[in-house]
Swiss-Prot record:
The keyword Oxidoreductase applies. It holds the Pfam family Aldedh. This is N-succinylglutamate 5-semialdehyde dehydrogenase. It catalyses: N-succinyl-L-glutamate 5-semialdehyde + NAD(+) + H2O = N-succinyl-L-glutamate + NADH + 2 H(+). PROSITE patterns: ALDEHYDE_DEHYDR_CYS, ALDEHYDE_DEHYDR_GLU. Its EC number is 1.2.1.71. It comes from Salmonella typhi. CDD domains: ALDH_SGSD_AstD. Keywords: Arginine metabolism, NAD, Oxidoreductase. Catalyzes the NAD-dependent reduction of succinylglutamate semialdehyde into succinylglutamate.
């Protein structure tokens, strides 16, 4: 029984699904997808639970969310192993994901009050009050790269605001989704407040097409995000938050501290086997001897990165990709760029055929025409050389995406110029592109999102503002508007 609807664990009536470890092919989870009727049932349960949940005092909702945080801490080792085994990422990195989930609770509570709490301004004849109200029933679509943390970034603020939810994890990480929901169950969520439906494309389409949804919160690919945007077009009454990845540039202007610059590049491009939406996909390196030396050092160090299993000892820097198919897609993207005229600096290599273990690849594309503007979700780094900083900014902005952008330079003025001219929601200076803070908004422009950033700003799309002018008494103004006559006439 792998669906949780209205407080009950039930068996899906849709397609049978099996999840294996992407490296060892060990079977980890088996279950059935939710069919359209069960998706509708989950929505009905969420709708029925909404009035009571929304009327709960905020402190009552907060108490349940904080109990969930306590359970995350108590089961950190178990959840870490589930995430690591299911995604293929190393244990150390899965542990950081669970830590991020725990930290998200306190941050979301602070963000609720800062962004969407209640504010009152005293007026001469009363008060002006700003309150926030939950939307109602929201669908949450989770990704596979951070199957615990990223859905958590929608679920926690949405519950705090008083919404009820239907959560569909990625079909590639059903085990993590189920494990997290079981902790929410133990935290004491009332029946119907949070519902779990497992499944792939058909389940997702059934969920996103429900008439009774009040909104949808999505993290995933641009292609799916655009599809959801088209599907919900003409429905302005529904809130839609899309986080859709990027084709992110990292500019290496000054690599005087060469090993530090190489380390930052590795962290930007290859952490999580290149499966972070903020990962550097395009490396822009200044022409000249220093740039040549930097690239040689990068290729040297990156060539020594050996992906490993989640539980290897010592731990590897990177593990496997989410699937053997994902690894194959990266290989095909590399070969395509070679065919266009790219010069391979470091060839990606499958460690073992049929698994998702893949070594990093680096290819130079300076002067190559018609390079696809796409997010290749894996450890493949494209290199361009540039002559001057204005050209670097032009290259950085030469994408339909706009999630993250970074600069390695000792010149503050160059960073200030980049802040003014970059088209990206995250612009870092001498910090990895993959570094982000939950105390700041997380999101992008262009094809990277629809201006609904998450993290600190997630509270914004989880509630709507209600403005009130209030007075405990009704009084006639001392000064009336022109043309109004309230004098009493004597009866004739």
């Amino acid at each position: 029984m792998t669906l949780w609807i209205n407080g009950d664990w039930i068996t899906g009536q849709g397609e049978r699904r099996r999840k294996t470890n992407p490296v060892s092919e060990e079977i980890l989870w088996q279950g059935n997808d939710a069919d359209a009727a069960q998706v509708a049932e989950a929505c009905q349960a969420a709708r029925a639970a909404f009035p009571r949940w929304a009327r709960q005092p905020f402190a009552a909702r907060q108490a349940i969310v904080e109990k969930f945080s306590v359970l995350l801490e108590a089961h950190k080792a178990d959840l870490t192993e589930v995430i690591a085994r299911e995604t293929g990422k190393p244990r150390w990195e899965a542990a950081t994901e669970v830590t991020a989930m725990i930290n998200k609770i306190a941050i979301s509570i602070k963000a609720y009050h800062a962004r969407t709490g209640e504010q009152k301004s005293e007026l001469v004849d009363g008060a002006a009050t700003l309150r926030h109200r939950p939307h109602g029933v929201l669908a949450v679509f989770g990704p596979y790269n951070f199957p615990g943390h990223l859905p958590n970034g929608h679920i926690v603020p949405a519950l705090l605001a008083g919404n009820t939810l239907i959560f569909k994890p990625s079909e590639l990480t059903p085990w993590t989704g189920e494990t997290v929901i079981k902790l929410w169950e133990r935290a004491g969520l009332p029946a119907g407040v949070l519902n779990l439906v497992q499944g792939g494309r058909e389940t997702g389409q059934a969920l996103s097409s429900l008439d009774d949804l009040d909104g949808l919160l999505f993290t995933g690919s641009a292609s799916t995000g655009y599809q959801l945007h088209r599907q919900l077009s003409g429905q302005p009454e529904k809130i839609l938050a899309l986080e859709m990845g990027g084709n992110n540039p990292l500019i290496i202007e000054d690599a005087t501290n060469m090993d530090a610059a190489v380390h930052l590049t590795l962290q930007s491009a290859f952490i999580t086997a290149g499966q972070r939406c903020t990962c550097a996909r395009r490396l822009l390196v200044k022409q000249g001897a220093q740039g040549d030396a930097f690239l040689a050092r990068l290729v040297d160090v990156a060539g020594r990165l050996q992906p490993g299993r989640w539980d290897d000892d010592p731990q590897p820097f990177i593990g496997g990709l989410i699937s053997a198919q994902a690894a194959q897609h990266v290989m095909e993207a590399w070969r395509q760029r070679e065919a266009l005229g790219g010069r391979t600096l470091l060839a990606p290599r499958k460690v073992k055929e049929g698994t998702s273990l893949l070594t990093p690849g680096i290819i130079e594309l300076t002067g190559v025409a018609d390079v696809p503007d796409e997010e290749v979700f894996g450890p493949l780094l494209n290199v361009w050389r540039y002559a001057h900083f204005d050209e670097a900014i032009r290259l950085a902005n030469n994408t339909r995406f706009g999630l993250s952008c970074g600069l390695v330079s000792t010149d503050r003025a160059q960073f200030e110029q980049l802040l003014l001219e970059a088209r990206a929601g995250i612009v870092n200076w001498n910090k990895p592109l993959t570094g982000a803070a939950s105390t700041a908004p997380f999101g992008g422009v262009g094809a990277s999102g629809n201006h609904r950033p998450s993290a600190w700003y997630a509270a914004d799309y989880c509630a709507w503002p209600m403005a009130s002018l209030e007075s405990p008494e009704l009084t006639l103004p001392a000064t009336l508007s022109p043309g109004l006559d309230f004098s009493r006439r004597e009866a004739v």
